Amino acid sequence: MATDAQMAQVAELEVEMMSDMYRRMTNACQAKCIATAFKESELTKGEAVCLDRCVAKYLDVHEKLGKRLTSMSQGDEAALQKIAQQ
């Protein structure tokens, strides 16, 4: 059973990972979609569409990876329990 300290540590790691993902997504999508020489104070329609697609792809990949890692982790846990029972 997880203690409060362990749960707090897990929550802290989740926040850190989400912050890192957000930072990487922001940097990657900005570099890809927004020109370094600003001509207008607002985003152009093309920039806005590019950012929307970039963020959507980033989040989609993040979700798919999370599901895949969870299933792999559960498979590993089941295998370890099976070995421990033998």
From Swiss-Prot:
Q: Could you confirm whether the keyword Ribosomal protein appears in this record?
A: no
**Membrane topology recorded in Swiss-Prot or TrEMBL:** Peripheral membrane protein
Could you list this entry's UniProt keywords, alphabetically sorted: Chaperone, Disulfide bond, Membrane, Metal-binding, Mitochondrion, Mitochondrion inner membrane, Protein transport, Translocation, Transport, Zinc
Q: Name one GO cellular component term.
A: mitochondrial inner membrane
The record's subcellular locations are: Mitochondrion inner membrane
Query: Where's the motif Twin CX3C motif?
Result: 29-54
Instruction: Tell me the protein family, please.
Output: Belongs to the small Tim family.
Its biological function? Mitochondrial intermembrane chaperone that participates in the import and insertion of multi-pass transmembrane proteins into the mitochondrial inner membrane. May also be required for the transfer of beta-barrel precursors from the TOM complex to the sorting and assembly machinery (SAM complex) of the outer membrane. Acts as a chaperone-like protein that protects the hydrophobic precursors from aggregation and guide them through the mitochondrial intermembrane space.
Copy the domain comment: The twin CX3C motif contains 4 conserved Cys residues that form 2 disulfide bonds in the mitochondrial intermembrane space. However, during the transit of tim-10/tin-10 from cytoplasm into mitochondrion, the Cys residues probably coordinate zinc, thereby preventing folding and allowing its transfer across mitochondrial outer membrane.
**Name of the protein in question:** Mitochondrial import inner membrane translocase subunit Tim10
